[in-house]
Amino acid sequence: MTSSRRRTTRKRGSWLLSAVAAVAAVGTPRPVIAQAADLTGAGATFPYPIYSKWFADYATVAGVKINYQSIGSGGGIRQLTEGTVDFAGSDAPMTDQEMARLKTPVLHVPTVLGAVVITYDLPEVTKPLKLTGEVVAEIFLGTIVKWNAPEIARLNPGLALPSKDILVVHRSDGSGTTYIFSDYLSTVSDSWRSGPGKGKELQWPVGLGGKGNEGVAGQVKQTPYSIGYVELAYARQNNLPFASIKNAAGTFVTPSIESVTAAAAGIELPPTTDFRVSIVNAPGKAAYPISSFTYLLVPKSMSSAKKQKALTDFLKWAIHAGEKEAPDLDYAPLPSYVVAILEKRLDSIARGAAP
């Protein structure tokens, strides 16, 4: 790793730690805006690094304290359904069945885009690996079990791959990151599609479980010869390498802000979209194939008009001022046409009837 890369990684890690510390330090809103309503949310760990920064910044800007529990997309949807939080975070769009269980209809509000990366710990290998979706699927199915297996070696000529067992690490909780990962594998691998399939929680054939993106990253970091999947920001924060993945155009693409943006450019959403879309395996030579929107799930009406306004105002701030902070934390900002759709959608949210 170059000294420039190390400085960049340290900067990102310090930025994230500062953001999390700032969230923890937020206390009672300043007296001049003490009437602002506080908000509670829970859900996805995938976007937590940028949400931490946003919530800290918005507390300073607007005096609104937002308490967000990074517990995984499945847990966030469950708490939203039970009515114990004001909003939820999820990388997986809600299914029709999940939405039918809600007391109040919700909007899917995309916030940023990110990449799920295939990260690993190979002490002998310093050059980034190249992998295909089919090979990744066979590794996580337990069919490919050695790092020097022919399927991996053919993709990485010249690399001295060790004859070591591959130790698979996956999520143990209900996870939007797992949803994105399994959505991609189901798209490119018949074996995966007919096996574990797509979902926030899976029956894993092999491997160790880690809770949250941070749990998987930590497990991979401390386990030689392991492989896992995490959001790009978590790999960078933990100084973990990640593979280039062969995309739909046949190009090996490194996950980055630019390649995630290219994946989003491969689709055009209509003004009537509900944003429940997949962009995995998107067309285009520059597109990273395991890319996704992440969402805040926002009730269309709330019992408290004050909270409704506070949440809507925060979202309007996030899709404008907040988007500018996305690249520093390894997320891609929303395309401008998506922001334009969201502006109209947020204006349409009904105000709560009670204060």
Q: PLM features: what roles do these ranges have?
A:
Residues 30-355:
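Flexible loop/hinge segments at secondary-structure junctions
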Residues 1-11:
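N-terminal secretory signal peptides that target proteins for export/translocation
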